[in-house]
Design a protein with these regions (language model features):
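ATP-dependent adenylate-handling active sites, centered on carboxylate activation for C-N bond formation
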Residues: 2-215
């Protein structure tokens, strides 16, 4: 691992992520942004909004029964002043789309299928109801930075090995989900966190510095 100190690491992560977003904003078709209200997609949206200097178009999805994600996405959209769209789905819509999503994914992995339902229905609605044909998403951040695994990793080496494994297997899970669900609806997915310069830098950070030693999320 490289030996940059924490201040240098934070500066480089910030600059490289901004560059990763910026280079993906150029498109010959209208661009939209998937916004869950979580940190990853919110960062992508905030960088883009600042760089473009005009309201971006954000899209969020939620169930009609418990739309907690919609609440946080709405808060972020209001803060950014985006042109925000909410797609509300219900149990029947999910069940009716299940076979089609499994066919698209070509996998029986339950977690991948479950996580794909919302993305598929959201992209279907975007394709049918708007002219957006390019979508930026917050994918891959969890695999790079560890997400919940940093709370439980027994050692820094174990964390690094798990992170490397998740990156190697991305095409089987999160990338598979995003690629199939988005492209099936004739939309191009762009993933700033997957920028090669960004990924190489983050994966070279001393894993000790990635472990959750702060007792916070």
């Amino acid at each position: 691992p490289m030996q940059d100190d924490m201040d240098t690491i934070l500066t480089n992560i910030r600059e490289k992520l901004i560059a990763g977003v910026e280079k993906r904003l150029d498109a010959d078709a209208p661009v939209g942004f998937l916004l869950s209200g979580g940190l990853d997609s919110s960062l992508v949206c905030s960088i883009a909004a600042k760089k473009l200097g005009k309201p971006i178009r954000t899209f969020a999805i939620g169930m009609d029964t418990d739309a907690i994600d919609l609440k946080y996405a709405r808060q972020t959209a209001e803060y950014l002043g985006s042109e925000h769209h909410e797609i509300i789905i219900n149990r029947d819509m999910v069940i009716n789309s299940l076979e089609e999503v499994i066919r698209l994914l070509g996998t029986w992995d339950i977690t991948t299928i479950r996580a794909s339902m919302g993305m598929y229905l959201l992209c279907k609605a975007i394709h049918e109801q708007t002219d957006v044909r390019v979508l930026l998403t917050g994918e891959i951040s969890d695999e790079l930075f560890g997400y919940k695994y940093t709370d439980y990793a027994p050692t820094a080496d174990a964390f690094q090995q798990e992170s490397q494994k998740r990156i190697r297997e991305l095409y089987m899970y999160d990338v598979l989900r995003a690629d199939r669900c988005i492209s099936a609806n004739s939309i191009e997915a762009r993933v700033p966190f997957g920028d090669l310069d960004f990924v190489r830098y983050v994966m070279a950070i001393d894993p000790e510095k990635k472990l959750n030693s702060y007792g916070k999320g």
